[in-house]
Amino acid sequence: MAIEIKGYIVRDSDQQIYDWFGIATTAPQNIRKAIAEANGAPLDVEISTCYGGDVFSGSEIYSALRGYSGGVHIRITGLAASAASVIAMAGPNEMSPTAQLMVHRVSSIAAGNYHAMDKSSNDLKEADKAIAAAYVAKSGMSEKDALKLMDAETWITAAHAVELGLVDKISDAATPQLINAAYGLPLPRAVIEKTRAMIAEGKAKSKEISKEYLDAGKPTAEQIQAKKDFAYAKLNLLEKSLFI
């Protein structure tokens, strides 16, 4: 059974929001569903162009694939960056000669006094070690060497990945479209939560208007305006999230 991992790695609860904006994502629930449908048959996982994303969601996907008893084979055909590079370590793998891996340190946003900053720093260091463990388990390199790669925000070619032991072999594949790597998720947390509330409000308002004018036989002015307002709000949120 084939699974494609692409776009951004996001939480299950956030995927609906990204879908709403038409942004490609992969969430743990997609992988769990595919594993259930495979029912013990081998999985052919293709990482096409995946920019990484949420650390914990990436860990869930990695663990689900690594623990699957039916067999997993992973092909990197475009870009496996950040959290996606961790997922690429979940089983026997191969990499297109034109593909790339990218590994780097975990990042986050924190606020507070110096105690909070110290805690945030320590948490990030522990998260880095957890991610490095995937590279260590795959390649046999030391944790120190794995963290050194992450320190430099390293871009790794297929040949170098094989040399490092991160990839088992180089495969033949079509040349992927050249892209610029994106850092961080394209939708800030505040935009996700605001959109979630707006969708819920829009659904409730739509039901209220539909019930009130059920016998009208055609859309009312209020219904048309409500749909326009909802569309404008969606476009405004998308503009702010992508261009700030």
Roles of regions detected by a PLM:
Residues M1-A83, A90-A99, S107-I244:
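N-terminal organellar transit peptides
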